[in-house]
From Swiss-Prot:
<keyword id="KW-0418">Kinase</keyword>
<keyword id="KW-0808">Transferase</keyword>
<comment type="function">
    <text>Essential for recycling GMP and indirectly, cGMP.</text>
</comment>
<keyword id="KW-0963">Cytoplasm</keyword>
<dbReference type="InterPro" id="IPR008144">
    <property type="entry name" value="Guanylate_kin-like_dom"/>
</dbReference>
<feature type="domain" description="Guanylate kinase-like">
    <location>
        <begin position="7"/>
        <end position="185"/>
    </location>
</feature>
<dbReference type="InterPro" id="IPR020590">
    <property type="entry name" value="Guanylate_kinase_CS"/>
</dbReference>
<dbReference type="GO" id="GO:0004385">
    <property type="term" value="F:guanylate kinase activity"/>
</dbReference>
<comment type="similarity">
    <text>Belongs to the guanylate kinase family.</text>
</comment>
<keyword id="KW-0067">ATP-binding</keyword>
<dbReference type="InterPro" id="IPR027417">
    <property type="entry name" value="P-loop_NTPase"/>
</dbReference>
<keyword id="KW-0547">Nucleotide-binding</keyword>
<dbReference type="InterPro" id="IPR017665">
    <property type="entry name" value="Guanylate_kinase"/>
</dbReference>
<dbReference type="GO" id="GO:0005829">
    <property type="term" value="C:cytosol"/>
</dbReference>
<protein>
    <recommendedName>
        <fullName>Guanylate kinase</fullName>
        <ecNumber>2.7.4.8</ecNumber>
    </recommendedName>
</protein>
<dbReference type="InterPro" id="IPR008145">
    <property type="entry name" value="GK/Ca_channel_bsu"/>
</dbReference>
<dbReference type="GO" id="GO:0005524">
    <property type="term" value="F:ATP binding"/>
</dbReference>
Amino acid sequence: MQFKHKGLIIILSSPSGTGKSSLAKELLKIDNNLRLSISVTTRKPRLGEVDGINYYFKTDLEFKTLVKQNKFLEYAKIYNDYYGTPKEYVKMLLKQGLDVLFDIDWQGVRSIKKNTNNVVTIFVLPPSLEILEQRLRNRATDNEETIKLRMQSAQHEISYANEYDYVVINDDFGQTLKKIHEIIVAERAKNFSYHAH
C-alpha cells in the first residue's frame, strides 16, 4: 500500500500593499512542493512581465471564448480587466501531488470553494489601515486618486477576512512567512491518500 500526499489548493489573499506577492515569491523559494497558479488576464503586460511565466495575456475576445468553453476554475473582473484560473493546468499539478498557490481575492475564493475540495484559504492583514496607506504611498507608483481607491477596496476586502480558514497579520515579514509556511505544512499532514497495489 502506498501513501501519497494529495495536492492542496492554497489561496493567499490580501489588500494591495500588504506584501502578498513578496510572501508568495518567498514561499515558492523555501518549499519545493509548491507551484504558483498562473492566471490568464486581459490586462496589458507590465514592464518585465513575461507571457506564460507571470500571466497568460489574452484579448477580451479570447478570454470570453475561454469562459464559454468552461476552461476556468474561477474568473473575475477586477478594476477594468479580467483574471481567470486555467482549470487543466491546476488539475495537472494537483494530480502530481503538488500544492498550488493562488494569489486571488475573496470572489475567487468563493467560486473555487464551490467547485473544488482540498482548499486552504489564508488572508494576510496589514498591521493597521494607517500602515497600509503609508506602504502604498512609499511605493510611489500610484497617484492620490488610485491610493484612495485602493484604500476603499482594502476596507471592502478586509470585511471578508472572516470567511478564510486562517488570518495572519503581516507586521514582520520573516515571522509572517514562517507562520504561513507552518499552516501549509500542518494542512498537508491532514491531507493524504493511499493506494493499494
